[in-house]
């Protein structure tokens, strides 16, 4: 596996002082302290669970799974994302502190997978809900591919500039036309507008009183005949 190149240190002064910038020091400290929030909804998450074992030992990368989004700086989505789960995913992402990163793992997360062909409730790409930093294709991806995706994310962190990363979130989030979603406001407050995600049904309900009022009586003789 390729090692991460971090050419930010000034090596002109030997054996005594290391000169660098605050931005480079911040990036270096975050390389080995990625705390992921595991968002698994389908079979792809089983492949990620195998990383916890001694064979792959993902602890060497400083990955410490967290159960709270407020303690995580990386969310790893694995599996199919449905319309019902979309508000929960957006809320979890908004509750994560900056800077935060997203890895989309598996075909179902990236494009909707095989469920997107005939399913009305499948979100065709998690990037329509939250910004994605690393795409990890596969059905499902191997654990080695997950390690490679984490390595690429660490390389991206090593090169980024802090002021560019702390940018305003997307003002609007556009959903696919097939889902009949609408453009919604930025959910920075954590209060997701449920009415925009679940529009009222076009069919109106008939009350019980109205149903029995206009229902014509049918005798047992007519029912038999």
Swiss-Prot record:
GO terms for biological process: aerobic respiration; electron transport coupled proton transport; photosynthesis, light reaction. GO terms for molecular function: 4 iron, 4 sulfur cluster binding; iron ion binding; NADH dehydrogenase (ubiquinone) activity; quinone binding. Its EC number is 7.1.1.-. It is a peripheral membrane protein. Disulfide bonds: none annotated. [4Fe-4S] cluster binds at residues 43-44, 108, 139. Binds 1 [4Fe-4S] cluster. Its main location: plastid. It is found in: Plastid, Chloroplast thylakoid membrane. It is an enzyme of class 7 (translocase). Belongs to the complex I 20 kDa subunit family. NDH shuttles electrons from NAD(P)H:plastoquinone, via FMN and iron-sulfur (Fe-S) centers, to quinones in the photosynthetic chain and possibly in a chloroplast respiratory chain. The immediate electron acceptor for the enzyme in this species is believed to be plastoquinone. Couples the redox reaction to proton translocation, and thus conserves the redox energy in a proton gradient. This is NAD(P)H-quinone oxidoreductase subunit K, chloroplastic. It comes from Capsella bursa-pastoris. The lineage of its organism: Eukaryota, Viridiplantae, Streptophyta, Embryophyta, Tracheophyta. The gene is ndhK.
